[in-house]
From Swiss-Prot:
The chain crosses the membrane at residues 23-43, 49-69, 90-110, 117-137, 144-164, 171-191, 215-235, 238-258, 277-297. Converts heme B (protoheme IX) to heme O by substitution of the vinyl group on carbon 2 of heme B porphyrin ring with a hydroxyethyl farnesyl side group. It comes from the Bacteria. This is Protoheme IX farnesyltransferase. Its main location: membrane. The gene is ctaB. It is an enzyme of class 2 (transferase). It comes from Bordetella petrii (strain ATCC BAA-461 / DSM 12804 / CCUG 43448). NCBIfam families: cyoE_ctaB, PRK04375.1-2. GO terms for molecular function: protoheme IX farnesyltransferase activity. Keywords: Cell inner membrane, Cell membrane, Heme biosynthesis, Membrane, Transferase, Transmembrane, Transmembrane helix.
């Protein structure tokens, strides 16, 4: 009995890794924040639960397909060489079945238990990431993460649509914030994984334009990010609590970017990459806290 259970557990763990759970968690978190910001009070619990489930399922399906498409590239990169698809321990048919099951279930949940708008927007995001970004943009242009970043920026709009049956300007402001955040986040990773990307033949910005050019653009995007994060306050979507948080977090982001530009090290690039994840989570948490503070005032 134990000998049979061990391989099954190992296979399930490999499936889970293909869905990139850490990345999925951040995306789903931003979607949930969008849900809570979409209404004056508390959103409908059913919409939150099933919206979260459906968005998570389709995100996981997209990441699994991404791993399948990039299996040969992943095999040449130290960071991704241990993925089951890169090692060939999971077949293409298994990955397609997994992605089809997750994606199909997600679409059914969103269509029948949330609303068709959220289903179609989430499906478009799936196509944008799994096909347009992975197949067309990533292997062809150093602007891959800039253009393709829209699909990764969509979660707040998906969450908003799940609760409000609409995607107003406020939701697109949140999308814009993540869209501007995405390039410096990924370029920091590409800097300290530069040799990996070069070995894999991917035209990431540090590979095609060099380290200093990339560091400059990280700094420029970090400044643009600080400006963009003031928009919720400017359009009266959020108040002073959010603005103070956004400026404090943005100041830390710019400080990291400035240090990286002045004096590069892999360790500092790694710290910026990790901080950028925390930054986005705290920024969206500040949006929610400010929203609730406004309701209680």
């Amino acid at each position: 009995m134990t000998s049979l259970a061990a391989p099954q557990t190992g296979l399930l763990r490999q499936y889970l890794v293909l869905t990139k759970p850490r990345v999925t968690q951040l995306a789903v978190f931003c979607a949930i924040i969008g849900m809570f910001l979409a209404v004056p009070g508390l959103p409908d619990p059913g919409r939150v639960v099933f919206g979260t489930l459906g968005i998570w399922l389709l995100a996981a399906a997209a990441f699994a397909i991404n791993c399948l498409i990039e299996q040969e590239i992943d095999a040449r990169m130290l960071r991704t060489a241990r993925r089951a698809t890169a090692r060939g321990t999971i077949s293409a048919a298994q990955v397609i079945s997994l992605s089809g099951l997750l994606g199909g279930a997600g679409m059914l949940v969103l269509y029948h238990l949330v609303n068709p708008l959220t289903m179609w927007l989430t499906f478009a995001t799936f196509v944008g990431y799994a096909i347009i970004y992975t197949v067309i943009l990533k292997p062809r242009t150093p602007q891959n993460i800039v253009i393709g970043g829209l699909s990764g920026a969509m979660p707040p709009a998906l969450g908003w649509a799940a609760v409000a049956d609409a995607v107003p300007a406020e939701a697109w402001v949140l999308v814009l914030i993540i869209f501007i955040w995405t390039p410096p986040h990924f370029w920091a990773l590409a800097l300290y994984r530069n040799h990996d990307y070069a070995k894999a033949g991917l035209p990431m910005l540090p590979v095609t334009h060099g380290q200093r050019f990339t560091r400059l653009h990280i700094l420029l995007y970090s400044l643009a990010l600080v400006a963009t994060t003031t928009l919720p306050y400017i359009i009266r979507m959020s108040g002073l609590l959010y603005l103070a948080s956004a400026l404090a977090l943005g100041g830390m982001f710019v400080a990291y970017a400035w240090r990286l530009y002045r004096e590069y090290s892999d360790a500092l690039a790694r710290r910026l990459f990790r901080f950028s994840i925390l930054y986005l989570a705290l920024l969206f948490a500040a949006l929610l806290m400010d929203h609730w503070a406004g309701l209680l005032a």
